[in-house]
């Protein structure tokens, strides 16, 4: 059984939706007034043809082409009542939570050639600032473990160059992390994982590239005590990496629990509307108080930061894909899911709404 199938079965068995979704009858109408609306996509895994590395895999190419088409045409369309109703408004942009391509974690001449093809296809589709690719909106992406887990390589170099051209953002000194504002909401993209805590000196499996330092400084300088809502995006999930482990085992984890704890400690000083990530290829939505999330099917909603672990949006090895549509206001986060059972040939709104106040 592969990781993807294991996670799908686990999610189904546990019902990991500790933040209870609303239905239309429970005050699920979209919020009105000032706010930031945007799409969230993840795990597109652009894949080149292994036998012909300078060409894209046809399945990957088709899925991601159709994904971009859906993103472009959703604004202005109606949302059914069972998914909250209303219209999809014009969005400020699209956030992509990583694994842009598939082979950035692999070595060898053939894989390097594949990376070039995959990266060229991704940038041609997604563009950068809106209208300079097939996507008509700005994209704000982070990198995932399939893009460059050790913080080096073609995609990492490409992202650093893209960040230098990205409009209306504040970029970290190393060029890899950035923040921006959309309609009164502050957004921070912090890469693969958040770290590394200087209080714990030991090897890490993945390179954080000083994302914790950037996040700490950015929030202090650009949000401070203003009370503005904050949205954080990274790639790896917090759910599995909150609990302490034997020091001899922790370096095998994708995210060191000490870094997860340090990350949460920084966030407690601010009004965090949402944490966004992908990686698991399964949608999970829950409140996070810094501890391992409760997995019981009937777990109470509880208190904590609203975490949105979105499904894959363009993976070549799956018919089922999804993206999310958010509106974040001064007081609440309002989220819906748009999903496909057949690799974006058709798609529909999931009959649920997630609406949570910002503490």
Language-model features: where?
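N-terminal secretory signal peptides
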Residues: 1-2
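N-terminal export signals
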Residues: 5-25
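N-terminal active-site segment of His-dependent metallophosphoesterases
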Residues: 24-112
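Short, solvent-exposed loop/turn elements at domain surfaces
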Residues: 38, 46-52, 196-198, 241, ...
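Active-site neighborhood of phospho(di)ester-bond hydrolases with catalytic His/Asp-centered motifs
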Residues: 40-42, 94-98, 140-144, 232-234, ...
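Short, flexible/disordered intra-domain loops and linkers
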Residues: 50-60, 106-117, 199-204, 243-255
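Extended active-site neighborhood of metal-dependent phosphoesterases/phosphodiesterases
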Residues: 103-224, 262-268, 285-335, 347, ...
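Short acidic, glycine-rich surface-loop motifs adjacent to enzyme active sites
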Residues: 222-242
């Amino acid at each position: 059984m592969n990781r993807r199938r294991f996670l799908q079965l686990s999610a189904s068995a546990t019902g990991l939706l500790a933040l209870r979704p609303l239905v239309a009858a429970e005050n699920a109408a979209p919020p009105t007034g000032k706010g930031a609306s945007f799409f969230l996509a993840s795990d597109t895994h652009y894949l080149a043809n292994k036998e012909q590395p300078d060409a894209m895999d046809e399945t990957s190419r088709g899925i991601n082409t159709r994904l971009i088409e859906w993103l472009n045409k959703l604004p202005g369309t109606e949302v059914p009542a069972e998914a909250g109703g209303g219209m999809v408004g014009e969005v400020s942009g699209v956030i992509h939570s990583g694994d842009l391509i598939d082979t950035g974690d692999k070595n060898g001449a053939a894989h390097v050639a594949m990376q070039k093809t995959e990266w060229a296809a991704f940038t041609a589709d997604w563009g950068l600032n809106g209208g300079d690719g097939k996507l008509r909106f700005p994209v704000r992406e982070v990198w995932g473990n399939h893009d460059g887990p050790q913080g080096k390589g073609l995609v990492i170099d490409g992202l650093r160059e893209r960040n230098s051209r990205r409009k209306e953002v504040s970029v970290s000194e190393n060029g890899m992390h950035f923040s921006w504002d959309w309609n009164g909401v502050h957004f921070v993209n912090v890469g693969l994982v958040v770290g590394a805590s200087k209080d714990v000196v030991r090897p890490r499996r993945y390179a954080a590239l000083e994302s914790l330092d950037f996040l700490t400084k950015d929030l202090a300088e650009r949000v401070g005590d203003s009370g503005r809502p904050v949205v954080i995006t990274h790639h790896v999930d917090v759910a599995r990496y909150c609990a302490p482990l034997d020091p001899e085992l922790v370096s095998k984890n994708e995210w060191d629990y000490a870094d997860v704890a340090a990350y949460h400690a920084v966030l407690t000083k601010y009004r965090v509307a949402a944490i966004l990530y992908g990686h698991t290829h399964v949608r999970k939505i829950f409140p996070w108080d810094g501890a391992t999330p409760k997995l019981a099917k009937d777990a109470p909603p509880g208190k904590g930061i609203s975490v949105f672990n979105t499904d894959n949006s363009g993976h070549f090895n799956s018919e089922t894909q999804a993206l999310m549509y958010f509106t974040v206001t001064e007081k609440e986060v309002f989220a819906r899911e748009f999903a496909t059972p057949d690799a974006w040939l058709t798609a529909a709104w999931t009959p649920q709404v997630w609406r949570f106040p910002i503490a």
